[in-house]
């Protein structure tokens, strides 16, 4: 498995079927706070998001608190501002890309000794992934990545924004199948507490940034 890392030191995985790298996790509050602090962005929208979904420490969350690690209630334009800060090539995925990532992660099994450890991934990313991998029923990349039983992720469907994902029912009851269903907000500009995002990076950046690439498995 080929991992590269963004400027917040969170991992992306190469998804060859659609020629992108994809964030292994939805974007966390830790990452978004770094963006606000370094870019000097407006903190008020972030406070609105926190009111919908309060934070939890990366090294102390329980199974029932997983969703509190991640940015939710965000709007597509705000997610794109974060993508621009991360650097060239970063973007919200298209519907086709997201579903290809889902299929890729579903095919990938985690080894018994998970490769996601604080030694390999220092900082919050390693803490979060180690605890996620240790949670019950999270023995596949699809589960650890929270593409299953996680959030609804913003994606681009032609000229409109829709959501893909199926949160765990304890967080938000639903019967969605992200491979066949899309989730559409009722009102434009509505902050939805179960909507988050992950990004893709288009282009073979991992070939140009070899110092930020690791093979694990």
Predicted regions and their residues:
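Short acidic N-proximal helix/loop "leader" segments that mark the beginning
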Residues: 1-14, 51-53
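A short linear-motif detector with a strong N-terminal bias
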Residues: 1-2, 50-51, 131-132, 174-180
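A short, contiguous structural element within a folded domain that forms the immediate neighborhood
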Residues: 115-141
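Extended hydrophobic/Leu-rich segments
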Residues: 5, 66, 105, 121, ...
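Active-site microenvironments of metalloenzymes and redox enzymes
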Residues: 16-114, 204-213, 217
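Short, solvent-exposed secondary-structure boundary motifs
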Residues: 1-6, 61-66, 132-134
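Short, solvent-exposed coil/turn segments
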Residues: 8-10, 15, 64, 137, ...
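Surface-exposed recognition segments
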Residues: 136-217
């Amino acid at each position: 498995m080929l991992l590269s890392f963004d400027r917040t030191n969170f991992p992306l995985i190469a998804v060859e079927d659609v020629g992108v790298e994809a964030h292994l996790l939805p974007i966390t509050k830790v990452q978004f706070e770094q963006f606000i602090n370094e870019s000097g962005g407006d903190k008020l929208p972030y406070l609105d998001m926190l009111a919908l979904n309060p934070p939890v420490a990366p090294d102390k969350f329980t199974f029932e608190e997983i969703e509190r690690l991640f940015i939710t209630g965000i709007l597509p334009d705000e997610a794109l501002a974060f993508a621009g800060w991360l650097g060239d090539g970063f973007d919200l995925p298209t519907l086709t890309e997201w579903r290809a990532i889902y299929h890729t992660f579903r095919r990938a099994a985690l080894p018994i000794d998970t490769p996601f450890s604080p030694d390999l991934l220092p900082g919050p990313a390693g803490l979060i992934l180690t605890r996620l991998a240790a949670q019950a029923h999270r023995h596949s990349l699809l589960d650890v990545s929270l593409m299953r039983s996680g959030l609804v992720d913003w994606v681009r469907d032609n000229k409109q924004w829709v959501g893909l994902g199926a949160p765990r029912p304890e967080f938000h009851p639903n019967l969605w199948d992200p491979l066949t269903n899309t989730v559409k907000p009722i009102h434009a500009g509505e902050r939805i507490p179960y909507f988050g995002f992950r990004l893709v990076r288009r282009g073979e950046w991992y070939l140009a940034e070899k110092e930020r690439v690791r093979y694990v498995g």
